[in-house]
């Protein structure tokens, strides 16, 4: 690792929805992708294979719970799961609700936009997201 500060060690990385000491789930403020969440490991680890098998399972349980909650509450056409870490080498997963008319569909959200006239979606009810995550994970 470098001596560069880690933004996910130094800040929550979004609006905190759920936390258990092992990982946290945050809602990211992204006007193009309403409901985009991150599942962030609490300690600084770079890769999934740096975790013990039981820890991998525990982290993915949080990722899958986040996907299920977003599907139930937001009814997206698709949900993308991504763990890149090229910019922030701190293990985290993006859980991204997608709609056929979003700016980048069907490409990844980091690609060039495929349309300029994508409709804005209302912000999700953060309290409903948080409560649904607690029901699934606590």
Describe the predicted segments one by one.
Residues 1-138:
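HIT superfamily nucleotide-processing domains
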């Amino acid at each position: 690792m470098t001596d560069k500060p880690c933004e996910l060690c130094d800040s929550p990385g979004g609006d905190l929805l759920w936390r258990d000491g092992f990982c946290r789930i945050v809602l990211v403020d992204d006007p193009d992708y309403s409901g985009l969440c991150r599942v962030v490991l609490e300690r600084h680890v770079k890769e999934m294979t740096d975790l013990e098998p039981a820890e991998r399972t525990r982290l993915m349980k949080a990722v899958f719970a986040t996907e299920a909650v977003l599907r139930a509450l937001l009814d997206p056409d698709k949900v993308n799961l991504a763990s890149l870490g090229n910019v922030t080498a701190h293990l985290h997963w993006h859980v991204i609700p997608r709609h056929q008319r979003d700016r980048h569909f069907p490409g990844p959200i980091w690609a060039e936009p495929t349309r300029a006239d994508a409709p804005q979606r209302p912000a999700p009810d953060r309290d409903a997201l948080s409560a649904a995550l607690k029901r699934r994970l606590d």
